[in-house]
A protein has these predicted regions:
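Helix-loop junctions on the cytosolic side of multi-pass membrane transporters
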Residues: 106, 133, 137, 178-210, ...
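Transmembrane alpha-helix termini and helix-breaking/packing motifs in multi-pass membrane transporters
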Residues: 41-47, 100-105, 160-182, 263-264, ...
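C-terminal transmembrane bundle of multi-pass solute transporters/carriers
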Residues: 67-70, 78, 82-84, 88, ...
Length: 422
């Protein structure tokens, strides 16, 4: 027995120095960003009282996420992702500190705010590609699912800051919240400079660089290679296509659900928070379960496909139910959603080589953004002529069909990615 124990490979610890730093840094910046972001939305509505200007405000933040990930992904496969992460956090700290100072003087200009949102949106787009490509490099072998279950819980807990943000905004105004966010970004940036992980992919990419090739030509070649890699990997392409449709339905849900609750129930926004709060509970519980319990490796593909279809059915039908049933369905949706997230991201990030992660994540994020924006626009137009619940059901039906076609229709290629020890 003792001899068998000696032969059994030791499981590497997840909570290494670098992983702890990146996780704590993410918590600090994520909570501060969630709080100030929602408060800024309230500020725009209070000052402009215009749905059109609010839509423009949202668009200026979202628009850079279509193009920026593609170019940043190619660049970040050749340069330090760690340096990019903490540099962008330092810049964000400066921007939010300046905004806090300006707004504390009572000065407000919507055009200036829109430009600032465009800059922040661009920074956020580049940051997300850098973070998503660097984070898996800090995870020890065999701990991908556990690490991403932690990430999903932290992202979910950021939603808790929304009611806190609302309360503080009404009590102290926007400037102190932006100041807090600046301090959060500064703290995260200082901590991230202490990460020691080596980025060996830089040397790998440098060795493949063509001598005498201009930076612009190399960038375009890297972008082509990124899409070529995605196109050549049948399983990754199927997953990316399905999640583009999932984002399409998610965009539709964003523009349908809150207006539906406000027009259907007295104090509908509070009913909305109650129902969707169960989604947060479900994702939190699900993330904690995934941290403790490992799914059977050989069944991850089957579980994922089932989850994709069931989520579409739940989201496509819950608005027809009484509020208590809605809450139960959203709880289930949260549990299943974190399962979907953990399986997909741990599988793909452990599968894609380090030197290609930036381009893959850039392409994946771009497809998701295009899907989300398309869903928002199309759903908004359809609700003018069709019942809102019917529109949401139609989008979710399309997503379920996409799961069957792309994920189910490419069983061998997708299962080869999902059913791996991570």
């Amino acid at each position: 027995m003792a001899e068998q124990n000696e032969l059994k490979p030791a499981v590497a610890p997840l909570w290494t120095r670098d992983f702890t730093i990146i996780t704590l840094g993410s918590v600090v910046s994520m909570l501060g960003n969630a709080m100030s972001g929602f408060a800024l939305s309230l500020l725009v509505l209070d000052y402009t009282d215009s749905p059109l200007l609010y839509a423009i405000y949202i668009a200026t933040f979202t628009a850079p996420q279509i193009v920026a990930p593609i170019f940043s992904g190619a660049i970040l496969d050749r340069f330090s992702r760690k340096r990019t992460i903490y540099t962008l956090d330092f810049i964000s700290a400066g921007i939010y500190a300046a905004a806090a100072l300006i707004l504390s003087q009572g000065w407000f200009s919507f055009p200036v705010l829109a430009v600032g949102c465009f800059i922040i949106g661009t920074i956020n787009s580049v940051y997300m590609v850098a973070y998503e490509s660097f984070y898996p490099m800090l995870i020890t072998e065999g701990n991908y699912s556990k690490a991403y279950s932690i990430a999903s819980v932290l992202e979910t807990l950021a939603a808790v800051m929304i009611p806190i943000s609302t309360y503080l905004y009404n009590k102290v105004g926007i400037a102190p919240l932006l100041g807090i966010n600046a301090a959060c970004f500064l703290t995260a940036a200082i901590a991230e400079t202490q990460i020691r992980a080596e980025e060996k992919y830089i040397e790998t990419q440098r060795a493949t660089a063509a001598e005498g090739e201009s930076s612009a030509r190399r960038l375009l070649r890297d972008i082509r290679e990124g899409f070529g890699f995605l196109w050549s990997e049948k399983g990754l392409l199927a997953v990316a296509c399905y999640f583009a449709f999932s984002s399409l339905a998610g965009g539709a849900s964003q523009v349908i659900t809150l207006p539906y609750f406000k027009s259907t129930f007295d104090n509908g926004e509070y009913v909305y928070m109650l129902v969707w709060g169960m989604m947060v509970v479900g994702r939190t519980v699900g993330g904690l379960v995934h941290y403790k319990v490992q799914l059977p490796t050989h069944r991850k593909y089957a579980i994922a496909l089932t989850v994709y279809i069931v989520i579409s059915v739940l989201e496509g039908t819950y608005l027809y139910m009484p509020v208590p049933v809605m809450m139960a369905m959203c709880l289930c949706n949260g549990l299943l959603g974190v399962t979907s997230y953990t399986i997909r991201i741990s599988a793909t990030q452990s599968y894609v080589p380090d030197e290609k992660k930036g381009r893959f994540n850039g392409a994946f994020n771009m497809l998701n953004t295009v899907g989300s924006l398309t869903g928002q626009l199309v759903a908004g137009a359809l609700t003018v002529i069709l019942p809102t619940r019917l529109v949401l059901t139609a989008f979710m039906t399309v997503t379920a069909v996409a799961a069957v076609i792309f994920v189910g229709g490419n069983r061998g290629a997708v299962s080869a990615i999902y059913n791996r020890q991570q």
